[in-house]
Swiss-Prot record:
May modulate lipid droplet formation throught interaction with SQLE. The gene is SMIM22. This is Small integral membrane protein 22. GO terms for cellular component: late endosome; membrane. Interacts with CANX and DDOST. Interacts with SQLE; this interaction modulates lipid droplet formation. Induction: Up-regulated in breast cancer. Residues 63-75 have a biased composition (Basic and acidic residues). Residues 60-83 are annotated as: Disordered. One of its GO terms (biological process) is regulation of cell cycle. It is a single-pass membrane protein. It comes from Homo sapiens. The chain crosses the membrane at residues 32-52. Keywords: Endosome, Membrane, Transmembrane, Transmembrane helix.
């Protein structure tokens, strides 16, 4: 699994050649895929930022107390089951 020095140098030269020619992607599909990936990552980072902001800024110091609710029967009584 070790990469030889020649392969590493060839890869570095290829990357440097792409940087010099300002052609980072081989086709427009590569560009579109990269834009979609960046959009996805931006959305994930924005959601994480919102979660952190909500946890840090909107938390109350004490535990929340909710009033107990009265349980109401749900549904309709089936009178056919009555004797």
């Amino acid at each position: 699994m070790a990469v030889s020095t020649e392969e590493l140098e060839a890869t570095v030269q290829e990357v440097l050649g792409r940087l010099k020619s300002h052609q980072f992607f081989q086709s427009t599909w590569d560009t579109v895929a990269f834009i979609v990936f960046l959009t996805f990552m931006g959305t994930v980072l924005l959601l994480l930022l919102l979660v952190v902001a909500h946890c840090c800024c909107c938390s109350s110091p004490g535990p929340r107390r909710e009033s107990p609710r009265k349980e109401r029967p749900k549904g309709v009584d089936n009178l056919a089951l009555e004797p």
